Amino acid sequence: MRTRTIFALGLLAAVTSASAQSAIDAYNITPTQMRGTARFVGMGGAFTSLGSDLSCMTQNPAGLGLYRHSDIGLTFDISIRNYAAQTETQKNSENETRVKFDNFGYVGVVNLSGAMNTFQWGVSYNRLAVMDRLTSGYNLGTSTSLSNYIAWYTNGVNSNDLLEDGDYDPYYNPDNDWLSVLAYNSFMINNPGSNLEEYSGLHQRGTVGDALYNVRERGYTDEYNIDFAGNISDMVFWGLGVGIYDLNYTREANYSESMSNALVYDHQIRALGSGNAGFNLYNWQAISGTGANLKFGVIVRPVEMLRLGFAIHTPTWLHLSHTTYGETSYNYTPDEAEGSDKTNSGDFSTPDNDYDSRLNTPWRFMVGASVVIGPKAIISLDYERVAYNDMKLKRQRYYDYDSFGGGYVDNTYANEDVKNYFRAANIIRVGAEYRINRNWSVRAGYNYQSSNVRKEASDGAMHISTAGTDPSYRFDNDTQNICLGLGYRYKAWYIDLAYQHTRQTGTFHAYTPFGESNSTLSTPQAKVTDKYNNIVISTGFRF
């Protein structure tokens, strides 16, 4: 079964099935993070024009061409994290510590005669991204309800199509939105009169309500690289690499509301009336996948002290498998109801929803320049552009709600959302290294990444579509990394240490703003700030 939900400002164009991947899914699983060896991190990742580091295989494979000796090494990091969410009335903060194994690699060097002095090859494992984070908060005095949002976009759908009844399962009606089905069978939305295509939510004039949310995300992106490089006359260094991706992401979200003077369904008289209302919406999502990309790079050394670098990464062509599940629990107590059974409570859930999709991540282009000041110092500068608005999503071809054909076709609506929500990210990396003596080096770096989200989307000026029954989403602002490093060499052995402070802010939305364009309702949200203090340790041996 396939689902898509299409929104426009003030007008619902169409609502169909809930099991197509969304632009938000693509955004959640494609973060660009600065991760690598301790030397790489200590210099802010500014290695597009540098080399002789195992992290070159994930950035510019031409950097392998500068190796004179074979190298084997590994890296791990200790990450101390703080997640904070600030609403108008509350602030919530959580801490956690994680230890990760980030990198293992080997580079072999073959000496040649002729114009190409050396040929290098390398293999490596790299943890490119960690998607672990926690967002939790509490909004007092909400001005609307998730139920009102669902009622707003469900208007026009006959309630007989949403109701589970005997052998009829509304989830297998391809015209139904799964969140509408979940809400109607949980009495979150109701028909206020005899019109079966009109709906009301729980929030009415005079309702007082609060909202609570907790979203736990976990995941990673790993890349396995096979790279080849060469050195032509110690002036031109080329590199070509193949990256194999392994991706895993889970998202567990709870959203609760409690209200007094709400518009609730009185099951004794089968009519609506004022009362107390409470519900919890639980969602679980898992995305796993594999993919591949290609990388090509060049480093040119026109004079001894100057190096210029360029690298291009193709999209990563990903094959993804999705699983989603949603569940509600509810409790409504009408003011005028009598007897011990006056409370209407229960729960309702979706079936497990499994489907596959395709995702092409953006192209990546990077340029860099570095100055080598004698045997003592290096200063390096990089620029990278990642066009997130060019991501492409594909869904399985299907003939009807339970019959899939072969192959994949463009997910037209999700691809339109990608262009509406996202833009290109610009990344600037600056790094420096100073060699104190033959054994010790100190390093510093700065890494800045602009937000890849359009201002209209992050500010809540447009409706945001999500897949499945989880309406929540988060958009991040700019990301900054400040880095320091220390290196020690003894004969063929080396050990490097780096400290990385990352600060990322953003906005969490429990669900999208909705309503007519001139009267859009504000929904529960929080300003979020994530801070990471990472200690990165690398060790290796050159021979």
Regions found by a protein language model. Give the residues of each.
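Bacterial Sec-dependent N-terminal signal peptides
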Residues: M1-A26, T539, F543
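A broad, structure-centric signal for solvent-exposed, well-ordered loop/edge residues
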Residues: F7-A8, A13-T16, L50, R81, ...
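Outer-membrane beta-barrel porins/channels
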Residues: Q21-R35, F40, V109-F543
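Outer-membrane beta-barrel translocator/receptor signature
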Residues: A38, L50-Q59, G65-T142, G219-D222
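A generic local structural motif
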Residues: Q59-N60, F296
